[in-house]
Amino acid sequence: MILENELLQLALGMAQAVLLLLCAPLVTGIIKKVKAWMQNRIGSSIWQEYYDIRKWWGKPTMLTPYTSITFRLAPCVYFLTTFAAACMLPGFLGGQTGFGDVFVFVYLLALGRFFMAVSSLDAATAFGGMGGSREVYVAAFVEPVVMLAVLSNVLHTNSTSLAGMSLRTDEVNLTVAGVLTCIAFFLVLLAENSRIPVDNPDTHLELTMIHECMTLEYSGRLLALIHWASQLKLLVFLVLFAMLYLPLDLPVVFKVLIGAVAVGVVETMNNKMRLFKVRVYLAAAGLMLLLAVVAQ
């Protein structure tokens, strides 16, 4: 009976992840549409990300003969680890899934980032190596702040399960510590997903790129997997932000849309900061989380 229940929860979690995977390009399209409206532009269709993925999927994959198997496997690992993290989220279809431990969730995403950084070095190109080194530099500051956000929520809810955290989120988010954690996690969300002000996902200037530098040598289906996984990762963080940190009594779908609009607004009102100022930005988020932990 217990095994059947666990298998059911796993199946529901995978169904939820598939739903998020299908909706991820739409959320990215909505963010771009919000940015276009705020800049008095018409902008591309909210369905444009689907067209781009279909375009890349139909093109051949060109690989240099000097790359190893790591270069080919990295997009698949990045995609699968992000999909596995999406399976662990509570809510939507799976109710309160019991296998979503927050530490496993964090390090699944870190594993995907590690493989992408290694693959950028594997191509032995100047821009790829630069992007990989910058990604690792940012990750060195992001990961401790993410763990502080996790610690703050664990202390609030007395649980490391994402499901357990979501059950007690209403009573937590109305406190001063909850508001500080909400703001800090939103700042971490932008940094973790390479959004402005930490990185610009739409830039064409190689010298200012971080995440996009690591994808310059990819093409075809491997490039489609990378972009799709990045869009899914952004949606996963928005769902997590909506379920655990956003203090609004609304359905999760509406809170995710509010988070997506907030990302678009913040990106429009800010410029990309210099690389060496990222640590100050993340230090501010870390300080808010530390205050949230002390305030409990």
Question: Which residues are covered by each model-predicted region?
Answer:
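Transmembrane alpha-helix boundary signature
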Residues: F83-G100, M116-T125, L155-T160
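Mid-bilayer segments of alpha-helical transmembrane spans in multi-pass integral membrane proteins
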Residues: V104-S119, A140-T157
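Alpha-helical transmembrane segments of helical membrane proteins, especially in multi-pass transport
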Residues: T215-D249, K255-G264
